[in-house]
């Protein structure tokens, strides 16, 4: 087992110069008051559109919750006390609302609830949710539209595979589905009578051995892999589940089949069959559970196998950016009782192979005795499929990695070869994104594209040179003509949540502005909004903050932008200490690199460890600062350093030109790849007085098989990896650097050792550096005490080295 806290690791850190345990600190009261404001509820519409559930997320769980036991095995983080995911996200309360009236209906929930879901029955009469407790694990609860709920006694759900996110955060509930009959639930239970968990042997049976006999494929660096036979035993113990059906009225539980490591189980649209994927040995110590060998089978409701769809071997030879051979993306055709659809590679799963078609879609109907029927082929890699409610109509997409071109075809799965190109665009071209087809719940519980005659409806972000203006369009499939039904105005950010009828005559929106908190409204095309909710402003103290979209150019002419935030008491002409906060992205061309993202018309809400807290401390913040890296996808990183320095210089120059920034007092920061960017800028420029690097990876040689969109390995492009490793230039970092890292970082490539080694490199070369390891925190930080402390660290560091630039370097703050 890989524990959450590594004692030898902490002992090593304690030996480092200047390292020691410190108590959690709190930021100033003004920051705390804003940070601890209540969260805004989130609505989930019922299939009938007559009701919505309203959940209030738990924003900051206490660090004690994150400190609960954690098993880090097979790419999953398991809480053995609950048999669910560790560090899961929950709602603290649940309410019903009638739509469109907005009338609230209280929902009976248990005290101190940690709720996940809910999931509506297909007829919208009932909903199911889970409650996670230390005593009972993951409980199953059922509610109705009157707000009455009850717990299904004797049911303990297994949330290891069905918790929403596969071990990386996500919801904490088990895998629960409504059957098409609206009366029955399919659930995954903790294996009955499984006994006590495996005990770590006092004496190992022998060494842990890995061996490759050639033919292996490059593997990305991953966290939380199996490490020994005991880990394997733990994985089997906690991941093994028992499928069962539950009668929603009586609570009767009927076991289905034998227990197994059930990765997924999906009810057929006809409600008579199950598509079950079961993981089995041999496991891998280099891959997560998703790559383990598995069997994909069709079962009847007694658990008897009626058809073997595929036996999938260990996916240890799949090339990076490639796909497995054999059936993948296996699913039910949602408008037939029991027809399977899946995708198979025609190029061996490797983009390096030149073939006329890369993928094909196959279909096989019950009783699954005939030969699969080919229904579509894609020239590029299959990107997704959305089905219509009636007939064989579907939208199928493919994508070409090098050009980033995504194409969408309208095809009839019942008439192979009959396909029309509907859209083709660069996936990074936000300005020409047609939007996403809106779906509708079918009587069997599946969701299909909503079709109104020849029309479908598209919902999109509406990116533009002035920011995002979400829209609702009617799109004619026959003529490919688009009619706009709604677009957010220039003073608000308003997005369509759902249609309230099949013709877009009424729809539900979420509307906000810089001074109006997000609320839900009912609209008609061209009509005025009618309020459904009236949530109050949770943070009135930040309402005077100035927010502005600023556009400018890089020295080579690439269009750039940032969102400028200024304190509410800012006086024009005052030059402020400034924070540049950013995250680099790669682009094929300057046109897409220069596109504006986001909107200044959104409600300003500051939470977590947001960089916007600096505004409350008297800083100007250049948020979402564009840091494009432009070039051929195969070689774009050859000039990463030069481009990111040019991006940063252009941003500072613009802010200084506007009169809001004191050039002598500018700092930089970022999270993950933004942290890597921060290290790079401090190593290769003198633009900044200090930096903040959260959960970064400054040594690219520790990610030797690629990172971000880099396609070459360390051995193919060693000079690029070395140049792009600010760790190698630690002796050049003279500006004070604050390194913050979750002690239990779960992100690929950003191992905590990255920041540990960077600290040693800068310290050993005489630089000013501080390393903060956050107990029990992953790649993103969640604990209440952690969030408070991180805000204190960041503000204190910048107050000392940026706001107070030129002052004494000694301080009692640390």
Question: What residue spans do the PLM features occupy?
Answer:
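Short beta-strand element of the alpha/beta-hydrolase
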Residues: 566, 574-585
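Hydrophobic h-region of N-terminal signal peptides that target proteins for export
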Residues: 12-20
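N-terminal cap/lid segment of alpha/beta-hydrolase-fold proteins
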Residues: 533-574
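Conserved hydrophobic/aromatic pocket- or pore-lining residues that grip, position, or stack substrates
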Residues: 296, 340, 422, 520, ...
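Beta-propeller folds
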Residues: 19-528, 534-545, 559, 594-595, ...
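Bacterial N-terminal signal peptides that target proteins for export
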Residues: 1-9
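Active-site-proximal cap/loop segments of hydrolase catalytic domains
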Residues: 88-93, 99-101, 585, 591, ...
């Amino acid at each position: 087992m890989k524990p959450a806290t590594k004692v030898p690791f902490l002992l090593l850190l304690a030996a480092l110069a200047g390292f020691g345990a410190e108590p959690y600190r709190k930021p100033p009261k003004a920051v705390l008051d804003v940070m601890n404001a209540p969260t805004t509820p989130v609505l989930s519409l019922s299939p009938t559109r007559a009701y919505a559930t309203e959940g209030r997320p738990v924003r900051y769980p206490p660090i004690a919750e994150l400190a609960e036991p954690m098993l880090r095995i097979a790419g999953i983080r398991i809480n053995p006390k609950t048999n669910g995911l560790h560090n899961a996200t929950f709602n603290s309360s649940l309410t019903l609302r009638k739509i469109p009236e907005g009338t609230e209906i209280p929902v009976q929930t248990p005290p101190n609830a940690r709720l996940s879901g809910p999931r509506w029955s297909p007829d919208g009469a009932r909903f199911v949710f889970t409650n996670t407790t230390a005593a009972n694990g993951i409980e199953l609860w059922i509610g109705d539209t009157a707000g009455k709920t009850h717990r299904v006694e004797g049911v303990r759900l297994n949330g290891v595979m069905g918790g929403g996110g596969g071990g990386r955060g996500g919801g904490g509930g088990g895998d629960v589905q409504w059957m098409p009959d609206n009366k029955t639930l399919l659930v995954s239970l903790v294996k009955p009578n499984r006994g006590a968990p495996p005990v770590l042997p006092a004496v190992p049976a022998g060494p842990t051995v890995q061996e490759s006999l050639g033919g292996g494929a490059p593997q990305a660096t991953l966290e939380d892999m199996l490490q020994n036979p005991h880990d394997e035993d733990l994985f089997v113990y906690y991941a093994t589940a028992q499928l069962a059906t539950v009668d929603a009225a009586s609570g009767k539980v009927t076991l289905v089949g034998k227990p197994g490591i059930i990765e997924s189980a999906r009810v057929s649209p006809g409600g008579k069959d199950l598509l079950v994927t079961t993981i089995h040995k041999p496991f891998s110590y280099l891959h997560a559970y998703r790559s383990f060998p598995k069997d994909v089978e069709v079962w009847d409701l007694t658990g008897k196998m009626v058809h073997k769809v595929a036996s999938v071997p260990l996916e240890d030879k799949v090339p990076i950016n490639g796909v497995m051979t054999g059936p993948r993306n296996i699913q039910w055709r949602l408008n037939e009782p029991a027809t399977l659809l899946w995708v198979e590679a025609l190029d061996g799963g490797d983009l390096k192979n030149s073939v006329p078609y890369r993928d094909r879609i196959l279909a096989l109907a019950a009783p699954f005795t005939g030969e699969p029927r080919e229904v579509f082929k894609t020239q590029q890699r299959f990107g997704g499929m959305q089905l219509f409610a009636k007939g064989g109509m579907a939208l199928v997409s493919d994508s070409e990695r090098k050009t980033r071109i995504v194409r969408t075809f309208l095809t009839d799965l019942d008439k192979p070869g009959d396909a029309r190109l509907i859209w083709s665009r660069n996936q990074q071209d936000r300005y020409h994104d047609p939007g996403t087809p809106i779906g509708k719940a079918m009587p069997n519980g599946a969701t299909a594209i909503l079709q109104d005659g020849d029309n479908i409806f598209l919902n999109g972000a509406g990116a533009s040179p002035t920011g995002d203006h979400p829209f609702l369009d009617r799109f004619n499939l026959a003529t490919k003509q688009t009619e706009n039904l709604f677009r957010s105005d220039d003073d608000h950010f308003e997005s369509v949540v759902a249609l309230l009828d099949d013709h877009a005559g009424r729809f539900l929106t979420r509307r906000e502005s810089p001074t109006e908190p997000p609320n839900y409204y009912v609209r008609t095309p061209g009509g005025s909004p009618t309020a459904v909710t009236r949530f109050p402003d949770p943070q009135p103290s930040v309402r005077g903050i100035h927010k502005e979209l600023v556009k400018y150019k890089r020295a080579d002419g690439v269009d750039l932008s940032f969102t400028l935030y200024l304190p509410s008491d800012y006086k024009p002409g005052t030059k402020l200490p400034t924070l540049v906060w950013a995250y680099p992205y790669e682009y094929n061309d300057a046109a897409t690199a220069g596109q504006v993202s986001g909107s200044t018309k959104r409600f300003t809400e500051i939470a977590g460890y947001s960089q916007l807290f600096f505004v409350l401390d008297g800083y100007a913040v250049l948020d979402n600062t564009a840091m494009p890296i432009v070039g051929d996808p195969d070689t774009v990183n050859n000039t990463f350093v030069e481009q990111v320095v040019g991006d940063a210089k252009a941003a500072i120059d613009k802010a200084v030109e506007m009169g809001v920034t004191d050039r002598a007092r500018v700092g930089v920061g970022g999270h993950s790849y933004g942290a890597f960017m921060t290290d790079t800028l401090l190593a290769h420029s003198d633009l900044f007085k200090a930096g903040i690097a959260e959960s970064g990876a400054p040594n690219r040689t520790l990610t030797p098989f690629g990172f971000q969109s880099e396609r070459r390995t360390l051995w193919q492009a060693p000079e690029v990896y070395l140049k792009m490793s600010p760790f190698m230039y630690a002796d050049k970092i003279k500006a004070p650097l604050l390194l913050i890292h979750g002690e239990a970082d779960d992100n690929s490539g950003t191992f905590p050792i990255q920041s540990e080694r960077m600290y040693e490199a800068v310290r050993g070369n005489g630089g000013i550096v501080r390393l903060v390891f956050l107990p029990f925190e992953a790649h993103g930080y969640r604990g209440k005490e952690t969030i408070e402390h991180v805000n204190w660290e960041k503000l204190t560091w910048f107050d000392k080295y940026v706001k107070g630039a030129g002052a004494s370097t000694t301080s009692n703050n640390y």
